Amino acid sequence: MAQNFGKIPSHKSYVLSLYRTVLRNIPKCCHSYAFQYEIKKTLSKQLFKHKHDKSSWSVYTLLNEFSLLNNCLLEGKLQEIKNLMKPLKKMKKQLETTKILNSLTSLGDVKTNDPEEVRRFHVLSAYIKRKQDLGLLPAYIPKTYQHKLLLPLALNEHACLKLFHIQQKLKNGPPSAGLSYTKEGRNQIWFVRSPINKGRQQSKKLGILIRKERKDSQKNIDNLNFCEINAAWALHEAIWEEYLESKKIIKVNLPKYLEYAANIPKSTKCNPSSQYQKIKEWVDPVREIMFELHSKSFQRVEYFNKYKEKLLKNGGQLAYFDKKSKEMYAKRLTLFRKMSKETLPYVTLFIEGRDLPSVLAKYGF
């Protein structure tokens, strides 16, 4: 069975040696940085492309050209090097041109539309389908009628539904800001949720904090799991050494011994509670590390509980966003009343600029 030349040690050694020699000779014999880069790039591509060649004639031809390139460099024949590289460039350009032509052919007559036009088209399509399902429109409708007659009706119906939702929201009264949280490990990260700071308006720092806490919590859990595994091995070592010295087998409830209580004093947490010296030597160092990890976790819990109190304080973020939400509601209510009084009675479906979608856009709805 034919074998790749790259797997033959003598061939691999020869190619790498020649490649290193050429790379050393390029800056010595060629003073143009652009041409140096071009030669190196072409060499790298060709070596990667023909890495798995099995044809002996192809490999032989390429090695001859490689050796000729090195000789041309040493003799300063840069024009001959360009001639050697021309077929490779030509092939690349042809391939790129073919790809472009194929992509253009596949595109056909498809045109890129404006996003607003696409939105209007979807509204019209949904309107026609709905009316056809109810038997209010025929199966075939000419394009002229669709755009000149049905499109204004479809947009008006869509805008009426939007207007109804706006009216209902304003009728429900001013929205209030509230506290929400996301849980990461033991931590509850509290933050203010309101109409002002939802979606893209949400604080980027909050997102960074949540991702950081998620990463740190997972790291803490992984470290505790690793310590539990090491504690089990340490207990086996302690039992074995105690048996060798006193011929006694230690009986220890390891999960209970490693159990951490958040409400006991620090001195009690970290002091060894075992009467066996070998347990103190082997298991207690791991136990102390686990207690430190637990302590760090509970400190973060306390920190976020205090942060919640800070958010709830008078003049804090909750009060600020609540005030801003009410101001936004009052502004929208004023605009809605103004629009209802001055513009809505004079809406005309088929006059652009005086139709309902244009009126809603004008007043920021």
UniProtKB/Swiss-Prot annotation:
Q: What sections of the sequence does the record tag as coiled-coil? A: none
Going by the UniProt record, its keywords in alphabetical order are: Glycoprotein, Mitochondrion
Superkingdom assignment: Eukaryota
Compartments where found: Mitochondrion
This protein's GO CC annotations: mitochondrion
Q: How is it modified after translation?
A: N-glycosylated. Glycosylation is important for correct localization of the protein.
The family line of this record is:
Belongs to the RRG1 family.
Could you tell me what this protein does?
Answer: Essential for respiratory growth and required for mitochondrial protein synthesis. Required for vacuolar acidification.
- In Swiss-Prot or TrEMBL terms, this protein is called Required for respiratory growth protein 1, mitochondrial
Q: Which organism is it from?
A: Saccharomyces cerevisiae (strain YJM789) (Baker's yeast)
Gene that produces this protein: RRG1
